A protein has these predicted regions:
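C-terminal subdomains that position terminal phosphate/3'-OH groups for nucleotidyl transfer/ligation
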Residues: 110-232
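Glycine- and charge-enriched loop/helix tracts that form the active or gating conduit
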Residues: 1-155
Length: 232
């Protein structure tokens, strides 16, 4: 804005904001594939306001992917953007954008937009869950825990993220039917979840179950765990 109050807007940013459009402003966008992740994250943040990505920007992103630009992304940069995106209001739009840009098959080939994991992520966001719980909810229905380990290793996810995701993936089905378990089976579950040493992880585990099954109430399971700790 000039001294006289005149807006200097060579890229028509004000017009795009009013139209709720996310658009790249120069050819330099194509020089850094991290910008694909970043604009996907921005859509995850502003989608609820009605924002969308400009057609020409999406076309450029698709061209960048076709040219192999995302193949060279540094693992830590991918994780940084993923972790931030998980905490946005509509984290599923991060993945939807990457799918539209044809980058999902390269960056996250085992994550599907139409699987229960994505629904659990959406519910986790609605519940204002922490990022670590959202991550575990997203991956809960992965068919093989080795896939989760490979994903976490590939992008150097923090150990607490991978540990919770693996725990939820392996034990969520058993935990959801906990009231049907025998005392021995319940004890086996608690020992597997390491409730005596990993209470915070156990609490996150219960929160993840709330995202996976809308009718789940972790109070009973939490009380059982507390009673067991009292006895030991």
């Amino acid at each position: 804005e000039s001294d006289s109050g005149e807006l200097f807007d060579p890229y028509h940013g004000k017009q795009d904001l009013e139209a709720k459009i996310l658009r790249h402003v120069s050819p330099a966008f194509a020089e850094d594939p991290v910008r694909i992740l970043r604009i996907a994250r921005f859509l995850a943040r502003y989608y609820y306001l009605g924002f969308k990505i400009a057609a020409e920007t999406m076309a450029l992103m698709q061209t960048m992917v076709a040219n192999g630009e995302v193949n060279a992304l540094v693992a830590e940069r991918v994780w940084k953007e993923l972790e931030r995106a998980l905490g946005e209001k509509n984290p599923e739009q991060f993945f939807a954008t990457l799918e539209n840009a044809h980058a999902m098959k390269i960056l996250f080939p085992t994550i599907r937009l139409n699987h229960q994991g994505m629904k659990a992520l959406i519910d986790a966001a609605k519940q204002n869950q922490t990022n670590i719980v959202r991550f575990a909810a997203l991956l809960h229905d992965t068919v093989d825990e080795k896939i989760i380990s490979a994903l976490c290793n590939q992008y150097r996810a923090p150990n607490d993220y991978s540990a919770l995701a693996l725990s939820v993936n392996k034990y969520y089905q058993t935990a959801l039917k906990a009231k049907q378990l025998s005392a021995d089976e319940l004890l086996t579950l608690f020992l597997a979840l390491d409730i005596f040493r990993r209470d915070e992880r156990f609490q996150d585990f219960l929160q993840a179950l709330k995202c996976i099954a809308s009718d789940f109430d972790g109070t009973w399971l939490k009380n059982c765990a507390n009673n067991l700790k009292t006895l030991s």
